[in-house]
Protein backbone atom coordinates (compact mmCIF):
# COMPACT_ATOMS: atom_id res chain seq x y z
CA UNK A 1 0.00 0.00 0.00
CA UNK A 2 1.32 3.42 -0.97
CA UNK A 3 1.35 5.72 2.03
CA UNK A 4 2.03 9.41 1.49
CA UNK A 5 3.06 10.13 5.07
CA UNK A 6 6.22 8.08 4.59
CA UNK A 7 7.60 10.97 2.53
CA UNK A 8 7.38 13.59 5.30
CA UNK A 9 11.15 13.63 5.82
CA UNK A 10 11.72 14.02 2.08
CA UNK A 11 9.34 16.98 1.81
CA UNK A 12 10.82 18.62 4.92
CA UNK A 13 14.33 18.24 3.50
CA UNK A 14 13.20 19.59 0.11
CA UNK A 15 11.54 22.65 1.64
CA UNK A 16 14.46 23.42 3.96
CA UNK A 17 17.06 22.93 1.23
CA UNK A 18 15.07 25.25 -1.04
CA UNK A 19 14.60 27.93 1.60
CA UNK A 20 18.26 28.19 2.62
CA UNK A 21 19.58 29.60 -0.71
CA UNK A 22 16.51 31.80 -1.18
CA UNK A 23 16.96 33.31 2.28
CA UNK A 24 20.70 33.73 1.70
CA UNK A 25 20.07 35.74 -1.48
CA UNK A 26 17.34 37.83 0.14
CA UNK A 27 19.39 38.64 3.23
CA UNK A 28 22.49 39.51 1.19
CA UNK A 29 20.40 41.73 -1.09
CA UNK A 30 18.95 43.59 1.90
CA UNK A 31 22.17 43.96 3.91
CA UNK A 32 24.71 44.50 1.11
CA UNK A 33 25.90 48.08 0.58
CA UNK A 34 24.91 49.57 -2.76
CA UNK A 35 27.60 51.69 -4.41
CA UNK A 36 28.09 52.07 -8.14
CA UNK A 37 31.29 54.09 -8.34
CA UNK A 38 34.09 53.76 -10.87
CA UNK A 39 35.91 51.32 -8.60
CA UNK A 40 32.97 48.92 -8.66
CA UNK A 41 32.74 49.04 -12.45
CA UNK A 42 36.43 48.33 -13.14
CA UNK A 43 37.90 44.85 -13.34
CA UNK A 44 40.22 43.70 -10.56
CA UNK A 45 43.59 42.26 -11.50
CA UNK A 46 45.53 41.57 -8.28
CA UNK A 47 45.53 45.22 -7.22
CA UNK A 48 47.11 46.45 -10.46
CA UNK A 49 45.34 48.87 -12.79
CA UNK A 50 44.07 46.90 -15.79
CA UNK A 51 45.67 47.68 -19.13
CA UNK A 52 43.52 47.19 -22.21
CA UNK A 53 40.32 45.17 -22.40
CA UNK A 54 39.48 42.58 -19.78
CA UNK A 55 37.77 40.41 -22.39
CA UNK A 56 39.81 37.95 -24.38
CA UNK A 57 38.76 34.99 -26.41
CA UNK A 58 40.00 31.51 -25.55
CA UNK A 59 40.67 28.96 -28.24
CA UNK A 60 38.18 26.13 -28.62
CA UNK A 61 40.96 23.60 -27.91
CA UNK A 62 40.99 24.69 -24.27
CA UNK A 63 37.30 23.85 -23.95
CA UNK A 64 37.82 20.44 -25.56
CA UNK A 65 40.51 19.56 -23.02
CA UNK A 66 38.34 20.84 -20.18
CA UNK A 67 35.36 18.83 -21.42
CA UNK A 68 37.37 15.62 -21.70
CA UNK A 69 38.79 16.22 -18.22
CA UNK A 70 35.27 16.63 -16.80
CA UNK A 71 34.12 13.42 -18.51
CA UNK A 72 36.92 11.39 -16.96
CA UNK A 73 36.45 13.11 -13.61
CA UNK A 74 32.80 12.05 -13.62
CA UNK A 75 33.91 8.56 -14.62
CA UNK A 76 36.04 8.43 -11.48
CA UNK A 77 33.10 9.56 -9.37
CA UNK A 78 30.98 6.72 -10.74
CA UNK A 79 33.62 3.98 -10.73
CA UNK A 80 35.07 4.53 -7.26
CA UNK A 81 31.91 3.52 -5.32
CA UNK A 82 31.45 0.61 -7.70
CA UNK A 83 34.99 -0.60 -7.04
CA UNK A 84 34.52 -0.32 -3.28
CA UNK A 85 31.45 -2.58 -3.36
CA UNK A 86 32.45 -4.85 -6.23
CA UNK A 87 32.21 -8.09 -4.24
CA UNK A 88 28.65 -7.32 -3.10
CA UNK A 89 27.15 -6.17 -6.40
CA UNK A 90 27.85 -9.15 -8.61
CA UNK A 91 28.51 -9.84 -12.26
CA UNK A 92 25.65 -7.84 -13.79
CA UNK A 93 26.93 -4.59 -12.32
CA UNK A 94 30.43 -5.49 -13.50
CA UNK A 95 29.10 -5.79 -17.06
CA UNK A 96 27.32 -2.44 -16.76
CA UNK A 97 30.49 -0.76 -15.49
CA UNK A 98 32.46 -2.41 -18.29
CA UNK A 99 29.99 -1.05 -20.84
CA UNK A 100 30.28 2.41 -19.25
CA UNK A 101 34.09 2.34 -19.52
CA UNK A 102 33.87 0.96 -23.07
CA UNK A 103 31.65 3.88 -24.14
CA UNK A 104 34.16 6.31 -22.63
CA UNK A 105 37.05 4.61 -24.43
CA UNK A 106 35.20 4.76 -27.75
CA UNK A 107 34.51 8.47 -27.14
CA UNK A 108 38.17 9.09 -26.32
CA UNK A 109 39.34 7.31 -29.47
CA UNK A 110 36.83 9.33 -31.50
CA UNK A 111 38.07 12.62 -29.98
CA UNK A 112 41.66 11.56 -30.61
CA UNK A 113 40.95 10.64 -34.26
CA UNK A 114 39.17 13.95 -34.84
CA UNK A 115 42.21 15.83 -33.52
CA UNK A 116 40.48 17.27 -30.46
CA UNK A 117 43.39 16.25 -28.23
CA UNK A 118 46.09 18.07 -30.19
CA UNK A 119 47.08 21.38 -28.66
CA UNK A 120 48.84 23.05 -31.61
UniProtKB/Swiss-Prot annotation:
Segments traversing the membrane: 9-29, 64-84, 88-108
GO MF annotations, alphabetized: NADH dehydrogenase (ubiquinone) activity; quinone binding
EC nos: 7.1.1.-
Enzyme class name: translocase
Keywords carried by this UniProt record: Chloroplast, Membrane, NAD, NADP, Plastid, Plastoquinone, Quinone, Thylakoid, Translocase, Transmembrane, Transmembrane helix, Transport
Main location: plastid
Gene Ontology terms: biological process: photosynthesis, light reaction
Pfam families named among the record's database cross-references: Oxidored_q4
Family matches, as InterPro entries: NAD(P)H_OxRDtase_bac/plastid (IPR023043), NADH_UbQ/plastoQ_OxRdtase_su3 (IPR000440), NDAH_ubi_oxred_su3_sf (IPR038430)
Similarity-based family: Belongs to the complex I subunit 3 family.
Its job: NDH shuttles electrons from NAD(P)H:plastoquinone, via FMN and iron-sulfur (Fe-S) centers, to quinones in the photosynthetic chain and possibly in a chloroplast respiratory chain. The immediate electron acceptor for the enzyme in this species is believed to be plastoquinone. Couples the redox reaction to proton translocation, and thus conserves the redox energy in a proton gradient.
The protein's assembly and partners: NDH is composed of at least 16 different subunits, 5 of which are encoded in the nucleus.
Full protein name: NAD(P)H-quinone oxidoreductase subunit 3, chloroplastic
Protein's organism: Phaseolus vulgaris (Kidney bean)
Gene name as annotated: ndhC
Amino acid sequence: MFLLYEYDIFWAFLIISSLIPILAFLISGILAPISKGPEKLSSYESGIEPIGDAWLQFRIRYYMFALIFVVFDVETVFLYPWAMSFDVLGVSVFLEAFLFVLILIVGSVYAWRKGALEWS
